[in-house]
């Protein structure tokens, strides 16, 4: 089951850069950055939420970091992201959103990968799947996620949660580049992402339909 709010656009396909550490996105250029791959504490209790808070300064947000959170700068702001239970505490920051995660796969240990992307409209990710639950938040622009069941369209400020093991391809849609975050909470004994051949894209519901 997937959770989302939707819109629609047509796109043309061009493959976006791979997500890597310290990509050009970190310098305000086109790219997809792995912000951090962080082991999570073993005492987290489901249901879990992805909490996103915005801060005015790097000093303030770094002071609010705990074992299940990270702090970083992206898209003109400072951000704190955490995986924890539902809470009213935003640690001195401005609350942006919280996203309830779907049940995690059974595992002895979990890790969290946080990704930040700045991608032109019409570009697509590679076809892939994850060994855990993925959540998206659109900072600006629009994006669409193609899966075997349907295509999920998202606008600025919207979120989406995807179960473990769903084959997908992400498409930047709309009239301007997409700026977006993703968090993957996954089985730490496995790679977070498995890429698949682009020929498998034909098995997914197109964002152009």
Give residue ranges: language-model regions.
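Jelly-roll (double-stranded beta-helix
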Residues: 3, 7-135, 142-209
């Amino acid at each position: 089951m997937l959770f989302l709010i939707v819109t629609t656009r047509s796109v043309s396909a061009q493959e976006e850069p791979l997500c890597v550490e310290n990509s050009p996105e970190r310098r305000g250029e086109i790219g997809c950055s792995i912000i951090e791959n962080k082991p999570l504490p073993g005492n987290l209790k489901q249901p879990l939420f992805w909490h996103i808070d915005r801060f005015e300064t790097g000093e303030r947000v770094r002071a609010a970091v705990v074992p299940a959170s990270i702090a970083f700068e992206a898209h003109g702001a400072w951000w704190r992201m955490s995986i924890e239970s539902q809470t009213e505490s935003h640690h001195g920051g401005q609350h942006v959103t919280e996203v309830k995660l779907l049940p995690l796969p059974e595992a002895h240990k979990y890790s969290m990968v946080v990704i930040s992307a700045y991608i032109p409209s019409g570009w697509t990710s590679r076809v892939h799947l994850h060994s855990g639950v993925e959540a998206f938040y659109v900072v600006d622009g629009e994006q669409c996620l193609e899966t075997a069941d349907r295509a999920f369209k998202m606008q600025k400020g919207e979120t989406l949660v995807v179960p473990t093991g769903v084959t997908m391809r992400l498409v930047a849609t709309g009239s301007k580049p997409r700026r977006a975050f993703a968090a993957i909470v996954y089985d730490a004994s496995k790679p977070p992402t498995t890429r698949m051949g682009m020929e498998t894209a034909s098995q997914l519901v197109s964002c152009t339909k």
